[in-house]
Each structure stands twice: as structure tokens, then as C-alpha cells.
Amino acid sequence: MNQLDTKFGEFGGMYVPELLIPALDQLEKAFLDAKEDPSFNEEFLSLLKDYAGRPTAMTLTRNLVSNPKVKLYLKREDLLHGGAHKTNQVLGQALLTKRMGKKEVIAETGAGQHGVATALACALLGLKARIYMGAKDVERQAPNVFRMKLMGAEVIPVNAGSGTLKDAVNEAMRDWSANYDTAHYLLGTAAGPHPFPTIVREYHRMIGEETRAQIMEKEGRLPDAVVACVGGGSNAIGMFADFIDEPSVRLVGVEPAGKGVHTKEHGATIVTGTKGILHGAYTFIMQDKEGQIEESYSVSAGLDYPAVGPQHAYLHDIGRAEYVAATDEEALNAFQLLARKEGIIPALESSHALAHALNMADEAEEETIIVVNLSGRGDKDLAHVINILGDDL
């Protein structure tokens, strides 16, 4: 019997081959045992603080917003070791891997950020890492591939399907099915079968907890809105978790509208998708009338995923969080604007959240505090952006 809820309303669940159920049950048990173990929590917190660099800063933007009624803050996950929020939960799951007595880690990666975080945690904790990456993403994200190899991880390009994140997840799950006795599948987002969405949320929830404490200290009140980009949705759920029970705080998730949600080229799963099962969970997915998974698209490899974490599906369903979409063009504009106005180069993923937050700031008619989760830094995207913008910089 599962001790944790396996679902969020009708969403979530464990739609996996029978042979993986014991591995998922073992993971849930390890997670619950670890939660009650002071030495585990102490080690996790000490790694977050002394290795990863938490708490991360909360920066009030100075020049970005022209509306005098708006204060726009950035939660600086881009300053975390590894370059993005990914490091938080990866350290937690890597510690769980050791706790379960396993020596190997299997992971998938899109932008390469989760792969880098997995590689650094495995290097630190003496685990062997096998990282699956879509062949197309291997090309798009060369610096991250080199980083992973430098830290001792094996990077396996996946040519199947469209050669992107979805295909990498399929291969990683196939590997895990064959090797779950010795290897832990370190899922990189708040999606997939139970207990992954819950574990990933809990190991990212310090993002929202720190945000609450920092904004109370700076402003003496909670923010009016927290805004985060949503691919699978791990940085967003980490930001939202501590505010779900605060009805005065708007939770805004920003999906990739790609070349426009009216085209076929986007990844706006909640905004345009329908309910179905992908990678072990019932959630919103992008599928055609026959139920075939459609290809998602985004300028940012990390948002290019045709499903979404089940808790986001649930928060949308009950109306607690709102989900919108920002186009490639809007994200690229926000990317350049933050660099020019504040001297901070954000990841293309985070630029989607920023783009929508800037629209919210323009429209605000009363005193408003907005916090954007700046989930990662843009170093990994520079070559990609230069290719797109060319001489227009």
C-alpha cells in the first residue's frame, strides 16, 4: 500500500509496467524513511548550503519595469551551483540513491541542465551516471554535453523519434526497467509516475519557502503573484508549493507558445492539451485525435516536453493556478531586455516567465509585487541565441 497519495485529484498515478512497481514502492519508502531521519535531512541541507550555495538571492529589478506601481523581484536560482534550480532535487535524489544501496544513476536531459546537475551530484557522491539525451539536443547544447563528460558521466545520444526529451525519457525508462536492482532513475522534473512528482516537489520546495521569508523581510507582506516557466514544471512547483494555501498569491505558470499556440509548433500543454497518459502519469498531454503524442516545440530545449507534471494539471483543474503561454519571440525579447537593463543573462526557459511577468507589470493598476523564478542562467543558450539573432543583437 502506498502511504502517500498517488494522485492529485484525478491526475498522476503509476501507469507503468508491472515490473517497475516494486522499484517505485521502494523509492517511496526510502523517501518517507529519509524524511524522518535527522541525519539525512542534515546532510541534504548542508549540501544545499555549502555546496550548492543556498539560500539564493532575491533581487529587486531596478530598470526593467516602467510602471512605478510595480516591484518586480527575481528569485535567483540562476546563481545556484550548476546554473539552474535543477541542482536542488538532484542532490536529494542522489542521497536517496545511496540510501537504497544503489551505485548507478540513470537520467534523461533536454537542455542538458538536469544532466549537468546529475553529473555533478554523482561526481560528488561517488555514483556512476548514465545520461540519455535526444540527438537533436546533443547538438543544441554542446557545452552542457562537455560539462557532463568532464564530470565523469556517460552521455548516450538518442536518435529515436524526434531525438528530443520525450525520446530520452523513453530510453531512460527502458534502461531502468532492465536495471532497477542496481540503478536509480533520477527523473529530472515533477512529472512521471508516483512518487516522482511528490519527491521532486518536496526537494524543490525551499525555492518558495525562501521566497516567502525573503519577501516578508523586504516588503513586510506576501507577493501578489509568483511567476515561473513550465515545461514538466519542477521549478514552478518548487516556487508554488509554499503559496498554494495562500489565496491572495496568484500562481502563474508560463508554458512555451513557440511560434504561436495556433500553429503546430509549441509546447503549451495545459493551454492547448487534453487529458491522457504519458511516462507513467495521467495528466494534460499534447496528442492528436487518435491519441498519438504530438511533437512539442520550443526555442528552449528545457520546455520542449509534450506533457506536464500532474500537480500542475490539478492546480489548473481546480482553478488555483493560472497557466498562460509566451512565444519564442517574447522570450527572446525578455532574454535581451534583462541582459541590457539589469546585467543578468537568464536561461531561455526562465525568459518565458519573465516575458509574461513584464506584461503583468505593464497592465497593473495598483501597487503590485511580482516575483519571477529565474530558474536558470543563460550561459548554455548563448550560441543558440547568437544563431537565431545573428546581427540583430
UniProtKB/Swiss-Prot annotation:
Origin: domain of life: Bacteria
Biochemical pathway: Amino-acid biosynthesis; L-tryptophan biosynthesis; L-tryptophan from chorismate: step 5/5
GO molecular function: tryptophan synthase activity
Gene3D superfamilies: 3.40.50.1100
Residue ranges of coiled coil: none
Requisite cofactors: pyridoxal 5'-phosphate
EC number: 4.2.1.20
Entry-annotated residues carrying N6-(pyridoxal phosphate)lysine: K86
Catalysed reaction equations from the record: (1S,2R)-1-C-(indol-3-yl)glycerol 3-phosphate + L-serine = D-glyceraldehyde 3-phosphate + L-tryptophan + H2O
Entry-linked Pfam families: PALP
InterPro entries, sorted: Trp_synth_b_CS, Trp_synth_beta, Trp_synth_beta/beta-like, TrpB-like_PALP, TrpB-like_PALP_sf
Keywords: Amino-acid biosynthesis, Aromatic amino acid biosynthesis, Lyase, Pyridoxal phosphate, Tryptophan biosynthesis
GO cellular component terms attached to this protein's record: cytoplasm
Function: The beta subunit is responsible for the synthesis of L-tryptophan from indole and L-serine.
Quaternary assembly: Tetramer of two alpha and two beta chains.
HAMAP family: Trp_synth_beta
Similarity comment: family membership: Belongs to the TrpB family.
Name of the protein described by the UniProt record: Tryptophan synthase beta chain
Organism per entry: Alteromonas mediterranea (strain DSM 17117 / CIP 110805 / LMG 28347 / Deep ecotype)
